[in-house]
Amino acid sequence: MNSKFILSLCAASVITISGCTTVAEMAGADSSTLNVAAAQGFNKTVQEASANKTLDTSSATYKRINAVFLRLKPYADQVNQTGQKFSWQLAVLKSDQVNAYVAPGGKVVFYTGIVNKLNLTDAEIAAVMGHEMVHALEEHSKNKIGAQALTDLALNIGLSAAGENVGQLGAAAAQLGAQ
């Protein structure tokens, strides 16, 4: 066996054992850092929505979403095992988009379209809200960053093992496949 293959096999074994979250932390994506970055991104989203007059802070839809959010927050705090206290925040954006998402640290964004187009009940809003909160609590963004770091590392090891003849087209194709 050649040494590059053995090195690749060892690296793959270590990566597999270490897990995505640990790799994300080794790459500098610890919970605290992610929460700070997410808060900055959330604040930018809120500022832009406010400037564009798409930030909803008073409609009946906003009031329903906010009421559900406020009811669920204490339960989310109780089950938070990330080691970081979340500063839960909600932004409701006026848009026909049928979507909601959460950023690390508990930054929840809801689009009015998900409630209005789907005629969601408060229980259904709670289901969507709870789903988003679980993403934050389970630190799925950190896992995704770790998975991407592992993909990049494996790609680099593979390209190194394949030698210099792979070329940019092969590297670009591999990178597209990783996404």
Regions from the PLM with identified roles:
Residues N2-S8, S18-Q179:
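A Zn2+-metalloprotease active-site environment signal
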